[in-house]
Curated annotation (Swiss-Prot):
Tyrosine phosphorylated. One of its GO terms (biological process) is negative regulation of natural killer cell activation. Residues 1-23 form the signal peptide. InterPro entries: Ig-like_dom, Ig-like_dom_sf, Ig-like_fold, Ig-like_Receptors_ImmuneReg. This is Leukocyte immunoglobulin-like receptor subfamily B member 4A. Keywords: Adaptive immunity, Cell membrane, Disulfide bond, Glycoprotein, Immunity, Immunoglobulin domain, Membrane, Phosphoprotein, Receptor, Repeat, Signal, Transmembrane, Transmembrane helix. Residues 24-238 are extracellular. Interacts (when tyrosine phosphorylated) with SH2 domain-containing phosphatases PTPN6/SHP-1 and PTPN11/SHP-2; interaction with PTPN6 enhances inhibition of mast cell activation. PROSITE patterns: IG_LIKE. It comes from Mus musculus (Mouse). Pfam families: Ig_2. It is a single-pass type I membrane protein.
Length: 335
């Protein structure tokens, strides 16, 4: 009887916090690992759990564990806590969740985070067909093989995209285990470094050493799209700007030539008007020469008064008398 009560009490202590967590109404926290969730053996890693400002304790829960794996008080910011793993080993590999508690109760569990340890086994070999340098739209295949009979292989793209593919291993007589990853219609998003790992089914978070790296370079096809690329648009804009500038320069040059021609014509017309005025105001000297000249002829004079106009700036005028001489012979007079 005492033993039964002890068992029931033990189960109550275990189930009570889990029931409170499951029934929690506080927002669930966020969990992540630094420097990442795939950690080489014997290196340190920090697991972070970020929740509410009212949190009093943060609990880290590992899958297949009965009690919280670790409990930490919040940092000075009070909205998160960190859990240190000084040296990564197989015992730390697994799936983790976190939650927090406050005066209002327990929060929900965070999303699951898989913490993987690499380096437990020898590395597999990675190859690519037909080439690591292909054009966009081509299908390629990665082959990951190992002398160790792994249960599965995983292909990982390192970098910002962080894509991964997992396949069950296949077996042949001369090749104990391998997996072929086919990527259909690759795009520039697949550019990057690829590695593969092997692991056993019963320990999915304990991987082998990383394979050799392969750098994949995907280039655009020449006729991939009828729309201009960014470089094409930039070139088109430069050409358009150049044409517009040329038209503006021609327009201003033509306008300048028109103004010059107009000023030249106006000046020429003004000069002609001045000459005509001077011709009308000046007296003309008319002479008449008879056909038969006689040294003894009589000279007649015809006087025509006129006024010489000087510059308009001068107000005084002078009278000038012009004489027109007419020479006639005596013989003409007698007649």
């Amino acid at each position: 009887m005492i033993a039964m009560l002890t068992v029931l009490l033990y189960l109550g202590l275990i189930l009570e916090p889990r029931t409170a967590v499951q029934a929690g109404h506080l927002p669930k926290p966020i969990i992540w690992a630094e420097p990442g969730s795939v950690i080489a053996a014997y290196t340190s890693v920090i697991t972070w759990c970020q929740g509410s400002w009212e949190a009093q304790y943060y609990h880290l829960y590992k899958e297949k564990s009965v009690n919280p794996w670790d409990t930490q008080v919040p940092l000075e910011t009070r909205n998160k806590a960190k859990f240190n793993i000084p040296s990564m080993t197989t015992s730390y590999a697994g799936i983790y969740k976190c939650y927090y508690e406050s005066a209002a109760g327990f929060s929900e569990h965070s999303d699951a985070m898989e913490l993987v340890m690499t380096g437990a086994y020898e590395n597999p070999s990675l190859s690519v067909y037909p080439s690591s340098n292909v054009t966009s739209g081509v299908s390629i295949s990665f082959s990951c093989s190992s002398s160790i009979v792994f249960g599965r292989f995983i292909l990982i793209q390192e970098g910002k995209h962080g894509l991964s593919w997992t396949l069950d291993s296949q077996h042949q007589a001369n090749q104990p285990s391998y997996a072929t990853f086919v990527l259909d219609a690759v795009t520039p998003n697949h550019n990057g470094t690829f590695r593969c790992y092997g692991y056993f089914r019963n320990e999915p978070q304990v991987w082998s050493k990383p394979s050799n790296s392969l750098d994949l370079m995907i280039s655009e096809t020449k006729d991939q799209s009828s729309t201009p690329t960014e470089d094409g648009l930039e070139t088109y804009q430069k050409i358009l700007i150049g044409v517009l500038v040329s038209f503006l320069l021609l327009f201003f040059l033509l306008l300048f030539l028109i103004l010059i021609g107009y000023q030249y014509g106006h000046k020429k017309k003004a000069n002609a008007s001045v000459k005509n005025t001077q011709s009308e105001n000046n007296a003309e000297l008319n002479s008449w020469n008879p056909q038969n000249e006689d040294p003894q002829g009589i000279v007649y004079a015809q006087v025509k008064p006129s006024r010489l106009q000087k510059d308009t700036a001068c107000k005084e005028t002078q009278d000038v008398t012009y004489a027109q001489l007419c020479i006639r012979t005596q013989e003409q007079n007698n007649s």
